[in-house]
Amino acid sequence: MLEKVRFDLPQDEIPTEWYNILPDLPEPLPEPQDPTGKSFEILKQVLPSKVLELEFSKERYIKIPEEVLQRYLQVGRPTPIIRARKLEEYLGGYIKIYMKMESHTYTGSHKINSALAHVYFAKLDNAKFVSTETGAGQWGSAVALASALFNIQAHIFMVRTSYYAKPYRRYLMQMYNAQVHPSPSEFTRYGREVLAKDPNTPGSLGIAISEAVYYALENGGKYVVGSVVNSDILFKTIAGMEAKKQMEMIGEDPDYIIGVVGGGSNYAALAYPFLGEELRKGKVRRKYIASGAIEVPKMTKGVYKYDYPDTAKILPMLKMYTIGSDFIPAPVYAGGLRYHAVAPTLSLLMYKGIVQARDYSQEEAFSWAKLFSQIEGWVPAPETSHALPILKEIVEEAKKSGEKKTVLISFSGHGLLDLANYADVLGFNKE
């Protein structure tokens, strides 16, 4: 008898609302701070007005505009849930593994979920263009496609080390007619200042954010935020809202929800619709575990305090786990994990002990990626691979308890454009 591995939600059952966790948090989220008195004014100028409004909304559910919903369908939503039956067998049969496959979107990752909303709202404001940062290129690719679909120009500031290490993501953005700049770049005043201090800098997401904000501010565009802030997480919860319906359809209730954190939007987008329900009931049964890169240990070695989300310190300060906005991470290939801080809502949940954190080295994560590819056939993005080592911990817990555990994992993107990076670390190029 055939065993089902793919679980699809019909297009006509796609969720029509985003979920906002703010009203369900265990305590109020600390307010942003503006020491200079200028940051809030800058935000009002550079963010789409509706995005800024939704950033502080206390409404639990927000209706998705029909124009955005239609384009969700166009780019591959709803995405399937895949059961990793062969990996379950390899790990001894102690756990059931369900993967929310955000790799199935047209750009190959979860990032398109919020890019469409941000760009749509920028278009409503009659923006001349949109600008944003990108690390590995996943967010940049998503903004490039969203901009093409809404017929508006995109300027993407790509962290310099990834710009050269991941040329195919750059080419994908250019296929969508985006203009892509290595960050720090000669294209902006701030970029030139950074390069003057260190011509060989690998760049950082903090620097790229600063360039994108300055460029929008000085040239009549709108800046679109790729992670961290509440509104971006809100837009991405379409993935978690779908997954909740799918798990109910399958007849499973996850014991663990796991995923990786760059700024936090990927993990939060999957986990929050499940966690919010538990917070409203006053009891959290599931285990929520988020992982990152040990080379950028903001979750495990960071401090929960107010810090700037960007290197130039032009945006309001947010209370979050951080290793410092000036931190320049090692040029690891999981570019999306190289951000210095964690989203304020996720930081609060970590601080309260509701969400646990883990960090893994590039070598360990990539070894798991190779194993996973051999067993299941899917090649995970370098970022996504950092969630896989959590499985060994869950297997040990299942062994001790004597109960089979169900895991839901955010398969946040594929690694088909990152094979050269895998080859470098795993030694494929050695004669």
Swiss-Prot record:
Presence of keyword Nucleus: no
Catalytic function, reaction form: (1S,2R)-1-C-(indol-3-yl)glycerol 3-phosphate + L-serine = D-glyceraldehyde 3-phosphate + L-tryptophan + H2O
Pathway involvement of the protein, from the record: Amino-acid biosynthesis; L-tryptophan biosynthesis; L-tryptophan from chorismate: step 5/5
Cellular component annotations (GO), alphabetically ordered: cytoplasm
Any Pfam family hit: PALP
Enzyme Commission (EC) number: 4.2.1.20
Cofactor(s) required for function per UniProt: pyridoxal 5'-phosphate
GO molecular function: L-serine hydro-lyase (adding indole, L-tryptophan-forming) activity; pyridoxal phosphate binding; tryptophan synthase activity
Residue numbers of N6-(pyridoxal phosphate)lysine PTMs: K111
PROSITE patterns: TRP_SYNTHASE_BETA
The keyword Acyltransferase is assigned to this record: no
InterPro entries per the UniProt record, alphabetical: Trp_synth_b-like, Trp_synth_b_CS, Trp_synth_beta/beta-like, TrpB-like_PALP, TrpB-like_PALP_sf
Function, in words: The beta subunit is responsible for the synthesis of L-tryptophan from indole and L-serine.
Family classification: Belongs to the TrpB family.
Subunit and interaction comment: Tetramer of two alpha and two beta chains.
Protein name, as recorded: Tryptophan synthase beta chain 2
Native organism: Sulfurisphaera tokodaii (strain DSM 16993 / JCM 10545 / NBRC 100140 / 7) (Sulfolobus tokodaii)
